[in-house]
């Protein structure tokens, strides 16, 4: 299922990111902030565990603690730009990495790196990547995780288009997809339009 997270702060910060004049420092800062705002909503249905603590007054207070572990899995390299924003709100989360590159001729995703913490298979996995264009990278990352026994997976992207959304819904109907915005289409080079440019280059200032 697709979830578009609508919030004025997200829309304002996304506008800054779309602006071609925005430098990589501000681009990265706004991506971090949007990621934090999104995970607040994404974890709204998280089932926290009841827990009791003793306060400084000596009284007992009922509260909540994390139950299942949460693992943030950025798709390298652009996904790294969303990791800090999520872990700022969920510092207990562990971090894995999946490395995929896009074949410039076939546009297919190829895996070159996979490293996930040793956690229970029912842990909540947040796959993060700013752009959901063709959906190839996200689709392959999810397949890699499922092949290794993980089933509680959510996909978190900043901007997506119908092509990528349809691919994930077709191949992974059990995976909830979260977007800050749904854009219009892909151009002939498979870039999102209007989009925000090459997310990896704009995060790391490599272009």
UniProtKB/Swiss-Prot annotation:
Intrachain disulfide bonds: none
Keyword Transferase: yes
EC number of the protein: 2.4.2.9
Activity regulation (UniProt): Allosterically activated by GTP.
Keyword annotations from UniProtKB, A to Z: Allosteric enzyme, Glycosyltransferase, GTP-binding, Magnesium, Nucleotide-binding, Transferase
Function: Catalyzes the conversion of uracil and 5-phospho-alpha-D-ribose 1-diphosphate (PRPP) to UMP and diphosphate.
Recorded name of the encoding gene: upp
Reactions it catalyzes: UMP + diphosphate = 5-phospho-alpha-D-ribose 1-diphosphate + uracil
Record: residues binding 5-phospho-alpha-D-ribose 1-diphosphate: 77, 102, 129-137, 198
Any GO MF annotation of the entry: magnesium ion binding
Signal peptide: none
GO BP annotations, alphabetical order: UMP salvage; uracil salvage
Cofactor: Mg(2+)
UniProt name for this protein: Uracil phosphoribosyltransferase
Origin species: Mycoplasma mobile (strain ATCC 43663 / 163K / NCTC 11711) (Mesomycoplasma mobile)
UniProt keyword annotation of Zinc present: no
Residues that bind uracil: 192, 197-199
Pathway(s) this gene product operates in, as recorded in its UniProt entry: Pyrimidine metabolism; UMP biosynthesis via salvage pathway; UMP from uracil: step 1/1
InterPro entries recorded: PRibTrfase_dom, PRTase-like, Upp_B, UPRTase/APRTase, Ura_phspho_trans
Cofactor note: Binds 1 Mg(2+) ion per subunit. The magnesium is bound as Mg-PRPP.
Stored HAMAP family: Upp_B
A Pfam family matched in the record: UPRTase
Family to which this protein belongs: Belongs to the UPRTase family.
